[in-house]
Amino acid sequence: MNLEEIYPITLQYQPFRDEDWRVVEEESHYVHRMLDGVLSNWPKNLLKEWLYRHPDCMEDYAFLNLERLKFTLETWPLERVPGSEAFKDESFCDNFENIEERAEDNNDWLARYMLKEGTWNTPIVLLENQDRYNLSTQVQLKQPYHLLEGHRRLSFLNGLRRLNKARPHHQVWLAKIHT
């Protein structure tokens, strides 16, 4: 199987890989290549935190047409940040709400960070879906917001909410589909 068969829609957005399919392209090179090319409207942080760090997940949302997404970095009050209802799989959120337990694990730096800071280290990405986009039968998009990236972070925030340890405001990348 070759890369074109594995990533039929997103090959042009993928970081360069070797013959064993391991990413070999440097992060900074990838970001510049995307900004100089097909994703020139994307914020650097999202190219790095989402597409470069999770390239195997791109196909999940390729039907949105990544080039049409526009992003705004916003600060939201805690009450506006959605909970499990924004997840494609709402049970995923439940599996990570035990932030205090996870923070005790020395390997879970994110849980420790969020428990200490009351927020995430980098904003989650939510697709604004007020217009009820139904672009694919593969993924049922949630309304009014669908979580695209940051599943563990949003799960941990829900755990912080339950413990009354969440900060009152959080940064969020809001994605909109422009036609």
Kindly label every feature range from the protein language model.
Residues 124-126, 157, 172:
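Generic structural hydrophobic/aromatic packing signal, biased to beta-strands
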Residues 130-133, 152-154, 177-179:
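Short, solvent-exposed loop/turn segments at secondary-structure junctions
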Residues 1-91:
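N-terminal extension/subdomain marker
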Residues 61-144, 165-166:
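Short alpha-helix boundary/capping and kink motifs at helix termini
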Residues 141-158:
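A sequence-level detector for short glycine-anchored, His/Arg-bearing signature motifs
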Residues 29-32, 54, 146, 151, ...:
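Histidine (H) residue identity feature
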Residues 159-179:
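Alpha-helical oligomerization segments
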